[in-house]
Amino acid sequence: MSLDPTPPRSDDGRLLWSRSEELTGFEALMWRVEADPRMRSTVVIVETLDLEPDWDRFVAATEWASRVVPRFRERIVTPFLGAGTPHWALDPDFDLHYHLRRLRLPEGAGTPGLFTLAEQIAMTPLDPSRPLWEATLVGGLPDGGAALVFKLSHVLSDGMGLAQLLAGLHSRSREPMTDKPQPPPPSGPPATLSHEVVRQVRSDLGLVGGAARSLLGVASSLVRPDRAVRDAVAYVVSARRVLSPPPAPPLPALAHRSPSWRFRTLDVPFAELRAAGKSVGGSVNDAYVAGLLGAFRRYSERRGEPLPPDRLMPVTLPVSIRREEHEPGGNHFAPARLSAPVGIADPAARVVDVRRRMKIALGEPALESVEIVSAWLARLPGAVVAGFGGGATKSNDLQASNIPGLRDDAFLAGAKIVRSYPFAPLPGCAAMIAMVTHGDTCCVAANLDAASFTDLAGFEQDLADGFAEVLALGRSRG
């Protein structure tokens, strides 16, 4: 999957990316559910580099990025007296020195040591009083290589938005660009009580206005009351499906949960994955999900839980609901809930069944109802919201995401980006697995709950085997 165009720039050279002062309802909900430490929305992107960048050049590049993308200098402000919704505001005490770190792996640690370090960085909470990101340059990888471990909050953006961001920030040349725009540091008035009151009133009016527009839509449909009733009933039934966990029971082998994360990766040739899906009338995403299900079936069976062919498992797949009017960045996705065919051993039949079920999930009339509900839930106390959010996600065995990536060579402070692994947060599920296409390689990044997966080496092999059997479809039928 290729990336959308690079975000446009303003006249002064800033990226037009995630500029709204307001959090969406879903973003506010993600922020509030962090009252439960197990619901933290930390994202870690690990980019491996062919060489170690010059530190001063890396610092200068990051300082430039903080001027081009003002969100890097903004923090989330909790409303006065705790009433109302949180919002973005410039951090008057922004300190780049705090956000940048430099580490070197011990001799012989290699790539496994890098991902162990990334796990520890991911499990360390971001400081909520500062802008929600940190960047760690890691040296000491084999053959003179290095890595960037970029940690940020999911509240900043979804996967598509982050892909747009990196497309706008990464260079296409190893040499320094002397003609890139140099906007001044962002500035703005300090937050005051009067500004806060006006902002909250505007936010509340927007929420009420949205509800009113929905009611007007219903009223106008009464010109055809028979159709209106059918559509209303269909929407309510659809919303119940969208907002409820999939009806499939979780796998017993993955029953336990903890706040501990473990990272595993897999590289898959993009052309082969696409050919595998196409060979049975499916897409890259269908083949990707089928490969994951094959891994879960193998893992469950090795743990003493053989699965019958009709066994299903609960899976959620975030799908983009971005529209043309949406500015790049931010969170614009909805959860497609799937009772996924984990018991099907034949990879071809599994891909076909995944495609059938995905079409049904994506065709839900109320797919975007999560955003409507989130806007109201975000007004509740954090502890209440955390309980609701955890209950809605902990029954999932797997959340899986497929993110577009950069197809051309990209560079960071003179170092070529070799691979990019997006480790998304674990919101109560056993596994969150994301895939980004970098060049001609699909980089699969698995964030696994350490209590759910007690045999990590075994699952790593299961993941490789699950994709291998799917990739074989493209070779045997090509």
Residue spans for each PLM region:
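Soluble acyl-CoA-dependent acyltransferase catalytic core bearing the H(X)4D motif
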Residues: 2-27, 35-37, 42-429, 433-464, ...
